[in-house]
Structures are given as C-alpha cells and as structure tokens.
C-alpha cells in the first residue's frame, strides 16, 4: 500500500513540473496572449499596457522549447518578468494561422517564419517601442534570442530589454557580464 501511495505521489509531483502542451504540440502558458497575430495591433496593445512585444517562435516536439517552458520560464524572477514586462505572441514554426507583419504582409505562420529566416526554436524576437511601417519583425527587432539559454542569460536579457538597454551604449554581452559580476556569480 505504501508503494502505491509513493508511486502516486511521484506521478503527481513529476507531472506538476511539466508544461502544458496544446493540441498543436506547442507549449501553453498564462503569459502567452491569444491574438489575431496582426503584429501591428499586438505592438500597439503591448505599448498601451507599457509592455514590450515579444514574439516567440516554437515548434511541436522542440526539446529546447520544452527546456525553456519546464526549467527556465517557471523560475520566479523570469516568470514575473514575463507577466510584468512582456506581451508575448506565440508563432508556430510550421503553423497555418495567418500572421500580419509590421509592413502589412500577411502570410501563414510557416511562411512568415521562412520570411524572417528563422531556423531555430525557440526564437524570441523583442520589438522596440518604435517600429517603422515598412519593417519586418526581424528587421526592426531590438534583440533576437535564438535557442534555449540558462537562467542568468534569460533573466539578464529580459531585464536589459525592460530597461531598454538596446537604446544605450552598453551592449547586452557587457551588461550580462556586469550583472553576473555584481551578483557574485563570476569574478
């Protein structure tokens, strides 16, 4: 009987750490917005909320997306940053839902991803406050984060974006190194 309860406890605790996955195979999170994927409208809404538009490109079965959703995004500081600072729109690398780019071009997700030359998932695209009407998302991006990174790189990038570090003189890599030094993580 003890073994049965132990097994049930293990199953419940291990499944609690797993991120939810939708019918399309993409991870679900309460900080991902359901929109019409018109990036101009999403950007305007993000700005109205005082947030940065973050476009995250993912795909079914992506082990690096899973790593981010299960190990990195749930970290309290990162989860708080996602809720407080970002308006997140998810794009399916192989999806068929129409996406309208900043220049007015409308394509299915998979074709828009190809237009952006996005090869890897996850891919996070962070938009600045001002985006030209003739721009593409990747052409106007304040920063692009391809792939899965650990806690400190992700947190420091989120913070650098939130303080609009991309508008200043300190590139992200120097900011990141300084933050690691100030936290006593590296010398």
Give the ranges of each region predicted by the language model.
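Non-catalytic, surface beta->alpha helical segment in thiol-disulfide oxidoreductase systems
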Residues: 114-169
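Conserved redox-active cysteine motifs that mediate thiol-disulfide chemistry
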Residues: 59-73
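N-terminal signal peptide c-region/cleavage motif recognized by signal peptidases
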Residues: 13-14
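Short active-site neighborhood of thiol/selenol oxidoreductases, capturing the structured segment around
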Residues: 49-63, 88
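N-proximal helix/coil linker or "cap" segments that precede and/or mark the start of modular domains
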Residues: 19-32, 167
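A short beta-strand-turn-helix
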Residues: 34-53, 82
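Sec-dependent signal peptide recognition
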Residues: 1-7
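Thiol-based oxidoreductase modules, predominantly thioredoxin-like and allied folds used
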Residues: 31-35, 75-107
């Amino acid at each position: 009987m003890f073994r049965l309860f132990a097994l049930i406890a293990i199953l419940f605790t291990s499944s609690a750490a797993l991120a939810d996955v939708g019918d399309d195979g993409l991870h679900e999170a309460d900080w991902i917005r359901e929109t019409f994927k018109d990036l101009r409208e999403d950007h305007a809404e993000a700005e109205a909320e005082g947030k940065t538009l973050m476009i995250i490109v993912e795909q079914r079965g992506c082990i690096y997306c899973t790593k981010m959703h299960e190990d990195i995004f749930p970290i309290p500081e990162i989860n708080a940053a996602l809720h407080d600072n970002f308006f997140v729109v998810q794009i399916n690398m192989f999806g068929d839902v129409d996406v309208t780019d900043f220049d007015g071009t409308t394509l299915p997700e998979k074709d828009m991803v190809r237009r952006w030359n996005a090869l890897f998932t996850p891919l996070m695209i962070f938009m600045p406050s001002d985006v030209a009407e003739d721009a593409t998302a990747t052409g106007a991006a304040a920063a692009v984060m391809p792939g899965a990174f650990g806690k400190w790189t992700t947190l420091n990038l989120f913070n650098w974006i939130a303080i609009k570090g991309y508008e200043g003189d300190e590139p992200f890599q120097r900011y990141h190194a300084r933050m690691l030094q100030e936290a006593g993580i590296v010398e």
